[in-house]
Amino acid sequence: MLRISVRHRNAAIALGTTATAVAVGSMYADKRNVSMEKKIPTPVNIGKKTIPSRADQLLKLSKGDQYDVLVIGGGATGCGAALDAQMRGLNTALIERGDFASETSGRSTKLIWAGIRYIATGFAALLRFRNLTRPIDALSDFKGEFKMVLGAHKERRILLDNNPHLTNWVPIAVPMKTWTIWPAPMGHPLFSIMPLVLPAVFKFYDSLCGFTCPPSHLMSSSRARRKFPQLEEDVKYVSVFYEGQHNDARTATCIGLTAAEEGATVANHTEMIGTIHENGDSGKVIGIKVRDNLSGKEFDVYAKAIIFAGGPFTDGLRKMEQPDCKAAVAGAAGSHIVLPGYYAPDGMGLLDMNTSDGRFLFFLPWQGSTLVGTTDRKEDAVSSPQPPEDEIKWLLSEAEKYLSPDLKVRRSDVLSAWQGYRPLARDPHAPPG
């Protein structure tokens, strides 16, 4: 692994785990009531800063000067780490082999999701019979999930407050066709009564952010059919809750540009192709070899601390420095499709909490159309992947579950589709599989 000074190693650890929301501003969470009509505050003139051109950035990057921090990867995490480092007074550089947010950070479901599924799965795991024999461990596991969800609520609030031009609240309706569900969602009998307790669950979800989100509420079947004429007639009621929504690629790109505005050296289409060691191959890493993918020019960049922020591609970066290292990241592929806007009328999304394979499936209003996703499949990440046709067909099939029989979702309705990879931590010492 990279050997660096204690001071810079600690900085790298802290920066590598910086959340996107922290990177874009102050740790301030407003406790006022939130309405759907967000007012964008009048900008304060604090002096215009000019972002250097890419050519100027590359010229600065190739001079051979040593940076305090060098970030590899221009997604949300990498851009956030670069901005955080630069704002802490560290001389920082960032490179991205493609365009900013062109991989994972631009291929999401566009939600600032606070983790309602984690709450549900946490309760399901806590109440499983086998955990009765290990109550302390079970409570500890649930506490970890709960703390993560609380943190997600806090970061969602910060991201919404700091980026009103890129974010909004989106209402999401959960239609219920029966008063009980069997087989039970998530494989736990308790969840068979989910339709009866769902409104209370959403109120609990509201409470986790101090009720600073628009309030969850019920919608009668008659009102639901007026708002969603395409719904099946046997829907008993609809429960509505709110999540944050944002333009993921623009959010990450704006963070990267803000880092450049604050003085960081930032360059896209610039790829790491090797490492530079202090005393041959046995010495510590003091820099990397870089290629400008537009001109083909190669040069060296030196840094005291290097952060790999390649998401699902991080193992590829690690192997340049340590060829025999074991995989630490697992890729989880997810496909999305975009349908015409009439599948999400009146700016309201839909959530299926009981798909045929037990996952959550969202139907979300997005730029005048309807975004549907996501699937989940474990596989090694590849750049710019194409969504498999069988997953597109599965999404279309699931989309019909709550729709009127008169409305058929056709393959020709798909306006666009994409696939992205979520990076999941993997124990390098665990056995294969």
Where is each model-derived feature located?
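Short hydrophobic core segments
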Residues: 71-72, 301-311
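C-terminal catalytic lobe of FAD-dependent flavoproteins
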Residues: 250, 258, 316-319, 324-371, ...
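Flavin (FAD/FMN) cofactor-binding and adjacent substrate-gating region
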Residues: 6-9, 32-40, 176-263, 267, ...
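Dinucleotide-binding Rossmann-like beta1-alpha1 core, especially the glycine-rich loop
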Residues: 110-227
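Glycine-rich FAD pyrophosphate-binding loop
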Residues: 86-108
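Core beta-strand elements of the Rossmann-like FAD/NAD(P) dinucleotide-binding domain
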Residues: 64-67, 294-305
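Glycine-rich Rossmann-fold phosphate-binding loop(s) that bind the pyrophosphate
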Residues: 73-75, 97
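Extreme N-terminal leader/targeting segments of oxidoreductases
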Residues: 2-69, 84-88
